[in-house]
Amino acid sequence: MKYEWRKQEKNLYGVKQTPIIVEVPKQKYILVKGKGNPNEVDFSDRISALYSLAYAIKMLFKIAMKNKTDNEIADFTVYPLEGFWKKVNGEELDKNKLEYTLMIKQPDFITQEIFTKALENIKKKKPDALYDEMSFREIEEGKSIQILHVGSYDEEPKSFEQMNEFARKRDLTIIGDFHKEIYLSNINRTSEEKQKTILRYSVK
């Protein structure tokens, strides 16, 4: 049986273009931190390395489960790329100063041991210094506001304003100086105006 996040986790990923409140539980991620302009090569290199590790984890799990019954999960769909972005308050946006954490969620059944083994395998197969910066950890975002943004990343402020107004009307306060973005579209295959991104703030 194959675990498919689009079908199994509609409460988190089946988002509309209007703000909603969600409770985001503790979840497992592989992640790598970075700083600088997302249009630079370093950013795309981090994404490529992160995806390579994600697929190494998937393949290792499939091999381990190859003799299991049809009723057991033996495969899963790789989750979309996500990222925490540090907000820039009261300043003109300078992309060269952006700080971010790129991540790909992992199913609950992926363990630290599987991550460690997959990391060892990918280092041997595709040596890259970036793998030394990657980690496996659990993150709990808790009560959050999220919205589906359709369009270019430069137009995200319009969606953030909807979220801010939604929060104000409900006396909710945004926690921290960062927000989450979940990239549902393949930017290499999707035109800017059709790109789908989930935007999320933790609130209290």
Q: What is each of the regions a protein language model found here?
A:
Residues 1-204:
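A solvent-exposed interaction/effector surface
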